[in-house]
Amino acid sequence: MEEIIAPISKEILKAELSEDKRLRFTNKSHNEIYVITYQDSPNVMKEIGRLREIAFRAAGGGTGKAMDIDEYDVMENPYKQLVVWNPEAEEILGGYRYLLGDEVQFDEHGKPVLATAHMFNFSEVFLKEYLPYTVELGRSFVTLEYQSTRAGSKGLFALDNLWDGLGALTVIKPNVKYFFGKMTMYPSYHRQGRDMILYFLNKHFGDKDKLITPMKPLEIETDKKMLENLFCYDSFKEDYKILNTEVRKLGYNIPPLVNAYMSLSPTMRMFGTAINYGFGDVEETGILIAVNEILEDKRVRHIESFVKQHPEAMKITSGAHPILTK
């Protein structure tokens, strides 16, 4: 386990987070969202790598390296980094990395060069009919200090701020129809609790079309009959109440990101779970969300609020910076 690098100076970060890289202001907490790449903001990338590694290690994952930066962050056509910046404290409070499906490269075997390609198989239908209109999301994190209730409203709305950034992407890139990403659970999470969550997700969101499948699917260890009897309702809401109660009985909560994704869209697709062996053996569940099926209250908050801030984005995309509009 390597020692994590020292923080990057605030002055250096501010110099790289120039106005042309700012995507929008957040709805809550008066934070700012930027989109950068390793090539145009190498020091911000280092700070992201530092904060990611701290957050993931604390949860039981991470790379074990001095910072979490991999080949997908630094390749020729790299993943873009969406970060939330707190201008008062002059620090990053969270982020995502993403790649637009129409920019995905393919290797000599015809496999997409995606960060999830070592864990999931992609069907021809997905590659042809979905991928060109999809944004792949990954490495979602909230800085450790902002995960605490001590952070007050800044911490409370960190995840909400990240959704604001994703909402803006759907406006600036109108051909984006889907978000593909992963819900991460850690090996330290209670096994029976994990099995309940995965069974519940598969029952209510399981993909019947096999668009994407895990190469080595994670098997549920808990007795299936017991889970079947436990989650006995057709209704998502009734089964969810049971899930929440049973997980709490074990002394755990449903992970915040799992809750957040479930509350985004009733038609989310779940593709099964794979173990990410190079990243602390975390358990990654693949999901797909259709932008036009995001629930109205979320759409108004994260997407339509951006249109109000940037009406020009609906006519031409000049309101966004060059990384997004190239």
Swiss-Prot record:
Query: Which gene name does the record give?
Result: glsB
Alphabetically ordered keywords of this record: Acyltransferase, Lipid biosynthesis, Lipid metabolism, Transferase
SUPFAM superfamilies, per the entry: Acyl-CoA N-acyltransferases (Nat) (SSF55729)
- Does the keyword Transferase belong to this entry? yes
Origin species, per record, is Phocaeicola vulgatus (strain ATCC 8482 / DSM 1447 / JCM 5826 / CCUG 4940 / NBRC 14291 / NCTC 11154)
Q: What is its EC number?
A: 2.3.2.-
Associated pathway: Lipid metabolism
**According to the lineage, what is the superkingdom?**
Bacteria
Q: Which GO terms describe its biological process?
A: lipid metabolic process
Record-given protein name = Glycine N(alpha)-acyltransferase
GO function term, MF aspect, one: acyltransferase activity
Its catalytic activity?
A: a (3R)-hydroxyacyl-[ACP] + glycine = a lyso-glycine lipid + holo-[ACP] + H(+); (3R)-hydroxyhexadecanoyl-[ACP] + glycine = N-[(3R)-3-hydroxyhexadecanoyl]-glycine + holo-[ACP] + H(+)
InterPro entries for the chain: Acyl_CoA_acyltransferase (IPR016181), Ornithine_N-alpha-AT (IPR052351)
